[in-house]
């Protein structure tokens, strides 16, 4: 069984299988699909402008709060939540290689829903500052294959990450839950610098 905090400390990322499951996973995934159907593409999303995406959806904010204890256990860090974002990807979407802004110091990318008859869409991650474990990829690049309920936890400001064009399926819901280290250089980004956001775990 993987030692999540140790692996995260040594590599800057770790895969957490089944961080969410059961009826809660079903509920959140169905919510994401329905919101995408009702709202349509978000043209203000500069990374993938023609795909449904949502900042701080209330359901995801509560999921953010719900998973905080698991995130702290997996990383070995005390964390503040910052913000949430999710997309419902479509065929041919591509996420270019990038690093994230300070509010994404510690991030979780969670697979919520896709057609189980379709192949898993990989996430690639690399960070030359960290030692690599060969089982997760060749050289300095890791390839994460996430089933529904699985998550990639990573240092978003340090690890470059990307997804190649989505050819494996037709629709996939993915949520990104972002945190900062309470004792780190970006602690002032708590709540994404929007005071008054609701997070019950630390209030």
Predicted regions and their residues:
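A short coil-to-beta-strand element that immediately follows conserved catalytic motifs
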Residues: 76-85
């Amino acid at each position: 069984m993987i030692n999540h905090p140790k692996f995260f400390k040594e590599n800057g990322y770790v895969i957490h299988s089944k961080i969410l499951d059961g009826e809660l996973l079903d509920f959140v995934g169905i919510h994401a699909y329905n919101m995408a159907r009702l709202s349509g593409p978000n043209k203000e999303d500069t990374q993938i402008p023609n795909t449904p995406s949502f900042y701080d959806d209330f359901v995801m904010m509560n999921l953010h709060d719900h998973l905080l204890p698991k995130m702290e256990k997996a990383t070995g860090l005390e964390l503040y939540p910052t913000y949430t974002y999710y997309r419902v990807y479509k065929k041919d979407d591509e996420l270019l290689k990038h690093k994230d802004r300070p509010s994404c110091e510690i991030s979780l990318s969670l697979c919520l829903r896709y057609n189980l008859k379709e192949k898993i869409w990989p996430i690639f991650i690399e960070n030359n500052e960290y030692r690599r474990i060969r089982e997760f990829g060749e050289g300095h690049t890791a390839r994460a294959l996430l089933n529904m309920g699985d998550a990639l936890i990573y240092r978003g400001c340090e690890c470059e990450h990307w997804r190649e064009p989505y050819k494996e399926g037709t629709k996939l819901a993915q949520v990104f839950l972002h945190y900062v280290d309470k004792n780190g250089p970006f602690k002032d980004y708590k709540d994404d610098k929007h005071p008054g956001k609701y997070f019950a775990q630390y209030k």
